[in-house]
Amino acid sequence: GVSSAAVSRYLNGGPLSEQKRAVIHEVVEKTGYRPDTAAQTLRTGKVNQVGVIAPSIGSQSVGQITAGIASELDAKSYLMLLGNTELDAQRELGYLTAMQRNHVAGIILLGSYYTPQLAQALKNCRVPVVVTGQRFQDVACVYNDDRTAARELAQRMLDHGRKRIVYIGGTERDDATGVQRREGVQDALNAAGLNGEQMPRICCNAFTMEEGQRCMQELLVRCPDLDGVVCVTDTVAFGAMRALREAGRHVGQDVGLAGVGDSWAGSMMEPGLATVRFYQKQVGQEAARILLQMLEENGS
């Protein structure tokens, strides 16, 4: 047998020999026992809940990031409280306030628009915060190199002889997808002796197939001789592909098409979509590890 103190250490992640840990683990699994988290909080003063604020839970990348976060939190017996903003800035601010009132130990904020109001709200947070997908000032961040990714996509097109490249981007309120990806494409064009700043481009209102199709139709009118299209996301590229086919253009032959995200659907299309992969699950895992380290250092 083992003592009640040993069981308590096991349930709370305390020091314990591997032999005792294995014995207790077997009993816990057989009985299906789960500790009362509210009682644990009252007894230890330690909050075991982390808030996660996401811009759109229907997004493939958001799903991958939250899966990574959950895997790390589960390993440390933390629960995840999820808030879905649907890109509503006021709802995002509301979640930041509400989660603190609900006594979360920390918050992970998935990339959003950086506004003075959000900057002030993050500054006023009473709990540790980690941001993913964006580079915000004065807060821990985990983000991808969007500029390099877009530059490499455009360079691939240039290497295949494309010279009249257009770009379907996103709102520049979003630095990562709106500014960094657009600048990456322009970098590649400038390096090739083309004028990146004069590149025909259009901003879609949402990362949807419908918007990709609409933007592509407009660019075909403006630039009928285009031979390459770089899109801000794969989903937007799928819509662009539809518009190109409707216009009688042959994707992969007379016009190149690329997107960002390495969506599973891209591999099923014929021809396949040129894309770049972001390891979003690892982004979520790293964000959770950073937050857990901050909580450990704070004694939370």
Predicted features and spans:
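Secondary-structure boundary/capping motif
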Residues: 16, 61-62, 91, 176-177, ...
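Alpha-helical recognition/docking segments in bacterial nutrient-uptake
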Residues: 22, 37, 45-155, 159, ...
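Generic recognition of short, well-ordered alpha-helical segments
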Residues: 19, 37, 63-65, 94, ...
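Short gly/ser/thr-rich secondary-structure transition/capping motifs
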Residues: 30-36, 90, 110-112, 213, ...
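N-terminal helix-turn-helix DNA-binding module of bacterial transcription factors
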Residues: 1-48
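Short beta-strand segments enriched in small/hydrophobic residues
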Residues: 4-9, 43-58, 156, 164-171
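Bacterial carbohydrate/catabolite-sensing allosteric modules
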Residues: 30, 71-76, 100, 124-131, ...
